[in-house]
Amino acid sequence: AFCCPSGWSAYDQNCY
């Protein structure tokens, strides 16, 4: 899984 930077949504198109 891709780890989101702080402030990103877990459902962002670039975040899985």
Swiss-Prot record:
GO terms for molecular function: metal ion binding; toxin activity. Calcium is required for ligand binding. Belongs to the snaclec family. N-glycosylated. Residues 11-16 form the C-type lectin domain. Disulfide bonds join 4-15. Heterotrimer; disulfide-linked. The heterotrimer consists of 1 heavy chain (a metalloproteinase) and 2 light chains: LC1 and LC2. Regulatory subunit of the blood coagulation factor X-activating enzyme. Activates coagulation factor X (F10) in a calcium-dependent manner by cleaving the Arg-Ile bond at position 234. Weakly hydrolyzes insulin B chain, fibrinogen and some components of the extracellular matrix in vitro, but does not activate prothrombin or plasminogen. The keyword Lipid metabolism does not apply. It is found in: Secreted. The keyword Cell division does not apply. The lineage of its organism: Eukaryota, Metazoa, Chordata, Craniata, Vertebrata. GO terms for cellular component: extracellular region. This is Snaclec factor X-activator 2 light chain 2. Keywords: Blood coagulation cascade activating toxin, Calcium, Disulfide bond, Glycoprotein, Hemostasis impairing toxin, Metal-binding, Secreted, Toxin. Expressed by the venom gland.
